[in-house]
Amino acid sequence: MEPFLLLLLVLLPAIVLVRYAFTYGHRTSTMPIGPPTLPFIGNIHQITKKYTHIKFTEWAAQYGGLYMLKIGNGNMAVITDRRLVKEVLDRKSGIYSHRPHSFVSHDLITKGNHLLVMHYGDQWRTFRRLVHQHLMETMVENHHTKIVNAEAIQLVRDYMIDPEHHMAHPKRYSNSITNSIVFGIRTANREGANMRRLYKLMEEWSEVMETGATPPVDLFPWLKLLPQWLFNNYIDRAKAIGVQMETLYVDILNKVIKRREDGHNNGTFMDKVLDSQEKHNLPWHQLAFIGGVLMEGGSDTSSSLTLAIVQALIQNPDVQRKAHAEIDAVVGHNRSPVWEDFEKLPYINMIIKEGHRWRPILPLCFPHALGEDDWVDGKFLPKGTIVVVNTWGMHMDPSQPDDPAAFIPERFAKHPQLAPDYVPGTWERRDHYGYGVGRRICPGIHLAERNMFLGIAKLLWAFDFQPGEGPIDSDPVTGYHNGFLYCAKDYSCRPVIRNEVIRDTIEREYATATADVFSRFTEG
């Protein structure tokens, strides 16, 4: 062989490799800036596996409200700027409402039928439309609030008669509301079988969805060829979660179908979906998942936020005193707060908004994906870019007037309305981002607002929350579980009933709720 050809054969692969080393895994000059990258892997080595939102917030302080991470040769834009959230995720929602494909969550766990990870398209629109019809504000106001009010008085009674298990009571509360509305099957106590199965499932799914918990197979498909034991058997773990999920959802759906076969159509969400099956013709797996998804979304989020707020109340007795004074002046002790008291109890609304800000349940919004090329503030975002809204970073903005680490409800004194009222307004007026953004905003926002108001208002009406025997760690790292959902670790709590009149009122209202509301539902 000629020496020149031999040299060419040797140099050509080296030239190609060097070229890829300078391009693969690196940002182009037109993209937003970000942390320094390494050839081929980009920023993968720098993304923490735990409490990723805190690292993303540190980078936001260094690189600004929009920066780009390279995940291999893929792109991840992180937004920690309220103005950009409005201009990009809200105003351009048609191209920013997609989801990045996930081999683990989409293919292995949900088979693409979970509303949270579902790709943007006709199936998503059908699911969303069905959910909206049952959870729009008028439906919640006219049909669901009476259920919330009844479950909230049981929440108070549970704290009163069983303070030892205070961490479990908000979970029962939110799960029972959701299951009653969706299936007509309430959760009567903290030992409810459906609830226990759901929270076990959610805990395992949250862990596997945390950044870094599984190999980046969507960016490096060849990783699927490697033995899964190298990555903590992630395929088997994901499939097992999928089996748990499908089995639970199908079991509950079958109970609804059996009840209907016995001649009882209770007008629940699933009853209405089944009534419209001739029109929508949803496959069996989708039929099971549309109800299961609502059970998930309504159970874990409200309960986690309630636990965070109670924790904050224990550590801030002045906040409790102000709330007690407001409630006593409006409500008294012979009845508990009801939804009609909302406008007269603005401080309770401030406490809830501050809870959303202080410990958001989703510190990082579930990732969006860009459907086509876009330019944002003169920077290029290619089609397929993963877009992460850093809720934690926006809520903990150090430029705000009050200490972002402190629990100060008064920072929302100029936000007297419910969260949905601020979503369509200007970015300067948005209260918080606890329910997400754009077209992917939580479809149960109206129900969730009533869950939170009635739950927190009644708890504060009834109790003085004091420290129990044991630690109360509210640190955002050491005091909170790592995972996709952000929830407080167990903490001590001593709920002290405020007086005997309130105790008697609780028992009387609970008896009324049992007779008038709970009796309409089966238990599970």
UniProtKB/Swiss-Prot annotation:
Requisite cofactors: heme
EC id: 1.-.-.-
Pathway: Mycotoxin biosynthesis; patulin biosynthesis
UniProt binding sites for heme: C442
Signal peptide feature range: none
Induction, as annotated: Expression is correlated with the production of patulin. Expression is positively regulated by the secondary metabolism regulator laeA. Expression is strongly decreased with increased sucrose concentrations. This decrease is lost in the presence of malic acid. Expression is increased with pH changes from 2.5 to 3.5 in the presence of a limiting concentration of sucrose, 50 mM. Natural phenols present in apple fruits such as chlorogenic acid or the flavonoid epicatechin modulate patulin biosynthesis.
PANTHER family on file: CYTOCHROME P450 MONOOXYGENASE ALNH-RELATED (PTHR46300:SF2), P450, PUTATIVE (EUROFUNG)-RELATED-RELATED (PTHR46300)
Name by which UniProt lists this protein: Cytochrome P450 monooxygenase patH
